[in-house]
From Swiss-Prot:
Pfam families per UniProt: RAMPs (PF03787)
SUBUNIT field: Part of the Csm effector complex that includes Cas10, Csm2, Csm3, Csm4 and Csm5.
Similarity comment: Belongs to the CRISPR-associated Csm5 family.
InterPro entries in alphabetical order: CRISPR-assoc_Csm5, RAMP_III_fam
PANTHER family reported for this sequence: CRISPR SYSTEM CMS PROTEIN CSM5 (PTHR38007:SF1)
Name this polypeptide is given: CRISPR system Cms protein Csm5
GO BP terms in the entry: defense response to virus
Gene Ontology molecular function: any one: RNA binding
Record's keyword annotation contains RNA-binding: yes
Keywords from the UniProt entry: Antiviral defense, RNA-binding
Organism: Methanocaldococcus jannaschii (strain ATCC 43067 / DSM 2661 / JAL-1 / JCM 10045 / NBRC 100440) (Methanococcus jannaschii)
Name of the encoding gene: csm5
Transmembrane residue ranges: none
Length: 418
């Protein structure tokens, strides 16, 4: 005998299935890396203030679909659709909603908002708004929006994201001093193409995971986050075509500050000294911070100098010019976090450009990346057309407002709190 479920339970289950199905129908989006909270031990020695220079987005792999929000008067109203459907107390209306949604999908796009759906069955959408957020996305743009990472609906910046950026900066500095080692790994045919990145990291840090000295660098998740969050619009600027393509909407932090705690154990600097042939022996927080600053800014400066050689939109160019001037003041750490930093901020590619003015290694690098592109025709064609380091990457994701490119994404300034 079949078990009879309560009406509301059936409806809740049905709406969950409906949302999952619609999300699959509309578009399948690759999951971004999940960021996990970095648990920090007691005995923190440094408090660092972080200030946004340009908008930042760190994703959690989830999105707001058109079933989750509607935009009105410059605000995105986030709604609880499951609660609304549960309140209907009528399976026929649930089925009506399902049919309405399916019949309004055109070219993989849903031409309805959550408000349209609720009003179609006599519900007041404002009764189900769980929060509001400023929106720079126009109300007629029915689109999916990438979610900012959060825990229990509270935004945060993962310490792991900052630590990862510092790790990349260190690897850059290591090969800046040991370029022949980098070239040897790239040349080594015994190392599989897709393993070369990992091998570069292991060679610079440790081939034995338990001996990874970055375990001595501990960074907390954001504390006292005071930020302005909005639905924002980004687009990819195509350097060759000198125009925009591929719009991406996201929930971004556009302004604000937050604090982090950093603990650096002595073993971290002992390993840095061994690897970089330095003689660091910091006795206080200021000296420890200065060492991190030198590592990070050497990398960030090279990235920005590379970016300034590219054909950027006017306001983006000005943003980079100011950023470079600020880095040269040498009074803070400058890092790029999250989405939009792209290829340059996640690899040692700018290092090759920096150390190869005569393009002696470029053909080798080009061949390597053509091979790594595999079945990605667009990526392969981009490399086939590249005649210099500056010909790649071919696109750059930038923050767009009122149809103008305003700034690159993800840059922060970090200062020591005394």
């Amino acid at each position: 005998m079949l078990k009879t479920y309560p009406l509301k339970m059936m409806m809740t289950s049905r709406i969950r299935i409906m949302k999952t199905t619609i999300n699959l129908i509309i578009r399948s989006i690759p999951m971004e890396n999940q960021y996990y909270s970095h648990l920090i031990q007691r005995g923190i020695t440094m408090e660092v203030k972080c200030e946004l220079i340009t908008p930042i987005f760190i994703g959690c792999g989830e999105e707001y679909s058109q079933l989750d929000y509607f935009i009105e008067d410059g605000l995105a109203h986030i709604i609880d659709l499951e609660k609304a459907v549960s309140d209907l107390d009528d399976l026929e209306k649930v089925d009506y909603i399902s049919g309405l949604i399916v019949s309004n999908i055109d070219n993989n796009r849903l031409n309805l908002t959550a408000k349209d759906i609720l009003e179609s069955v006599g519900l007041n959408p404002y009764d189900y708004v769980i929060r509001k957020i400023e929106s720079e996305i126009f109300s007629n743009k029915k689109t999916r929006v990438k979610k900012f990472i959060n825990q229990n609906n509270t935004y945060y910046i993962p310490g792991s994201s900052i630590k990862g950026a510092i790790r990349t900066a260190y690897i850059f500095n290591y090969y800046d001093k040991n370029l022949p080692e980098l070239l040897k790994i790239l040349d080594d045919r015994n190392i599989k193409l897709h393993d070369k990145g990992k091998e570069l990291e292991k060679n610079a840090i440790s081939k034995d995971i338990p001996k990874d000295f970055f375990k001595y660098l501990k960074i907390s998740d954001s504390l006292n986050l005071e930020g302005e969050f909005k639905f924002i619009h980004t687009k990819r600027w195509n350097y060759r075509k000198k125009k925009f393509d591929v719009p991406i909407n996201m929930e971004g932090m556009t302004k604000g500050t937050f604090s982090i705690n950093i603990k650096i154990e002595d073993e971290f600097f002992k390993n840095i000294n061994k690897r970089l042939k330095t003689n660091y022996n910091p006795k206080d927080d200021e000296k420890k911070f200065d060492i991190l600053k030198n590592l990070c800014n050497n990398f960030s400066k090279t990235v920005v100098e590379f970016e300034l050689k590219k054909n950027n939109p006017v306001y983006v160019e000005k943003s980079y010019e100011k950023l470079l001037a600020d880095i040269n003041k040498d009074d803070a750490i400058y890092l790029n976090l999250g989405f939009g930093g792209g290829f340059l901020n996640k690899t040692v590619y700018p290092l090759l450009w920096k150390n190869d003015e005569n393009h002696l290694y470029f053909r080798k690098i080009k061949s390597l990346f053509i091979a790594l592109s595999g079945g990605n025709k667009n990526l392969k064609n981009a490399w086939l057309k590249a005649n210099s380091y500056l010909d790649f990457p071919t696109t750059k994701t930038v923050y767009v407002k009122n149809n103008s490119a305003i700034a690159p994404l993800g840059w922060i300034k970090m200062t020591l709190v005394e």
